[in-house]
Design a protein with these regions (language model features):
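Positively charged n-region of N-terminal signal peptides that target proteins for export
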Residues: 1-6
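Bacterial N-terminal signal peptides
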Residues: 7-16
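Sec/Tat signal peptide C-region and signal peptidase I cleavage site
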Residues: 17-21
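N-terminal amphipathic, basic helical "cap/leader" segment at the start of enzyme domains
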Residues: 22-133
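Generic beta-structure capping elements
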Residues: 32, 140-142, 210-212
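Small-aliphatic-rich amphipathic alpha-helix that forms the alpha element of a beta-alpha
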Residues: 47, 66, 94, 135-139, ...
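Short coil/turn connectors at secondary-structure junctions
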Residues: 131-134, 200-202
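A glycine-rich helix N-cap at a beta->alpha junction
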Residues: 196-213
């Protein structure tokens, strides 16, 4: 009985290492806890940005809850998300940048699909605190999914959709007392290359999350 308990309380980075992040295997997240949190009006009063992060990695359960709140599936029969998207394009991908590598959030499987191994946190922001924070979410839009939209509409609607996701993450963090800040300062050319993005995939924003210092 002791071994399962130890596994459940280890931080997310160590947990990913045990799951084989270095050989690029998917990592299954625990089911999100949907019955937790403070009342909405209290959460709105608590929402704020913070740039002071404890370097301690997030626990697997906290990461699962955060990702579900940001853009998880809340209607299983239709696959629709906690954040709205124009025409239900669902054009935004959430990349999870940890000290061990970059992962792509799979909302349907509630899992992390490894993209690249290695610490690329410094590429997820130009401010000094980013490379020491445990987690940055990078919001990437895929214009190829936005069928029948012209170039101007793609930029407009995708930017709004990313904003909805980022605000969901903000509200979850406010509810749980986490530190969080959304940023436009990202080394887009270099990070896009490292994430192997296509020309029609664009990094819009990044959002750094962690326990408060």
């Amino acid at each position: 009985m002791k071994q399962p308990l130890r596994v459940m309380i280890i931080p997310i980075v160590a947990w990913i290492c045990q799951a084989g992040a270095q050989d690029l295997k998917p990592v299954q997240l625990p089911p999100p806890q949907k019955e937790i949190g403070k009342p909405l009006m209290q959460v709105l009063s608590l929402r704020h940005s913070s740039r002071d992060f404890d370097p301690k990695p997030l626990l697997p359960q906290d990461l699962s809850n955060l990702l579900w709140a940001a853009d998880g599936i809340n209607r299983g029969e239709s696959g629709k998300r906690t954040a709205p998207s124009a025409m239900n394009w669902q054009e935004t991908d959430v990349y999870v940048i940890l000290s061990d590598g970059a992962f792509l959030y799979d909302a349907k499987a509630n899992s992390l699909n490894p993209v690249i191994a290695g610490d690329v946190r410094a590429l997820a922001g130009t401010q000094g605190f980013v490379k020491g924070a445990p987690l940055t979410l990078v919001y990437v839009v895929d214009y190829a999914r936005m069928t029948k939209a012209n170039d101007e509409d793609k930029k407009l609607y995708s930017a709004a959709d990313v904003g909805f996701i980022a605000e969901n993450a903000y509200l979850y963090c406010a509810s749980q007392g986490f530190a969080v800040v959304v940023r436009g300062s990202v080394d887009r050319p270099v990070l896009s290359e490292r994430l192997r993005l296509r020309p029609d995939q664009k990094i819009i924003l990044a959002q750094t999350v962690g326990y408060p210092k």
